[in-house]
Structures are given as C-alpha cells and as structure tokens.
Amino acid sequence: MALPFALLMALVVLSCKSSCSLDCDLPQTHSLGHRRTMMLLAQMRRISLFSCLKDRHDFRFPQEEFDGNQFQKAEAISVLHEVIQQTFNLFSTKDSSVAWDERLLDKLYTELYQQLNDLEACVMQEVWVGGTPLMNEDSILAVRKYFQRITLYLTEKKYSPCAWEVVRAEIMRSFSSSRNLQERLRRKE
C-alpha cells in the first residue's frame, strides 16, 4: 500500500511542478494550439468571402485592447482568455452547429478548450505567485461588447451562410491580433 501511495504522490508533485513551472509564460503548446485554431478556422470556409461582399460589416474590433503596451501580463492573459472564451461560446451555439462541418467544429472546440485550460493555469499561477490583479474590466468589457456585436449581426442576418463566413473571417482577424499580443508579451519577458 505504501509504494503505490508514494508513487501517486511523486506523480502529483511532478505534475504540479510541470504545470506550475510555466511561470505564466504562455507556453509553446498554447502557441501551437493557437496556430491549429487558425488552421481549423481557415478549413471551415465553405463559401468564398468575395461572394459575401454585400454582407461585410465593421464589428469595431477593440484593437486598442490588443496593443499590449499598457497591459500587465495578467491583464493581457485575461483579455486573451476572454477572446477564446467568447469564440468558444459563439461556435458552441445550435446555429453554429448547423452552419459548419461537425468534424471541424469538434476539433475547434477541442483546441479552444485546451487553450482556455492553458490560460487558466497561467492566470491561477499569476494569482498564486504574485497576487497580481487579473482583470482590466474595461478591456474585458470591450471584448464582450465586440462579441455581442458579432452575435447581433448574425441574428440580424438570420445566421445566413454569408453572415457566418463574414464572422469566421472576423474571428480569424481577432485571433491574429491575439497572436500578436502573445508575441509582444513573450518579447517583454
């Protein structure tokens, strides 16, 4: 009995050490997951964006929230987390499951979920180690309003294929800005 318990404790310690040693550095696995998410979003394209030019819309992407200069690391991570959470919510709707290939959508859910877990572990460590305040409420609110505008647009367009295509392209744009923010954070370290 003592040997299995000791082995279990050793595994717990090693597991904690590997996940707690991230030092909130947005791990390489998160970066790879981010890249895979972008590839999945690109693969999800069903129709040409050019055939949907009449449906283009300015969602007023909150670019200032992604500039990264005014952020503390924990605040930036909270903004990244919010973008991924809102993207997950957007593509988890019943209307989304009708619009997209189910196999690709399942892969997208998996990637987004893993990124959320990576960021949550990072946020928890930042609180545990530094006691840093995690959220800039204005930034989080700006991201939420951005996604509300996207949801309203989809509703107004009755979740048409072109509306979803415009939204898919917009989400790719937001993920590109998120990636740029991550890179700036890494360079600051």
From Swiss-Prot:
Family annotation (SMART domains): IFabd
Membrane among the record's keywords? no
Q: Does the keyword Signal apply?
A: yes
Task: Indicate the secretion signal residues.
Answer: 1-20
Please give the positions of the paired cysteines in each disulfide bond: 24-122, 52-162
Gene Ontology terms: cellular component: extracellular region; extracellular space
The cellular location(s) given in this protein's UniProt record come to: Secreted
**Which InterPro entries does the record match to this protein?**
4_helix_cytokine-like_core, Interferon_alpha/beta/delta
Cite the entry's keywords alphabetically. Antiviral defense, Cytokine, Disulfide bond, Secreted, Signal
Q: What does this protein do?
A: Produced by macrophages, IFN-alpha have antiviral activities. Interferon stimulates the production of two enzymes: a protein kinase and an oligoadenylate synthetase.
- Identification of the protein by name: Interferon alpha-6
Source organism of the structure: Homo sapiens
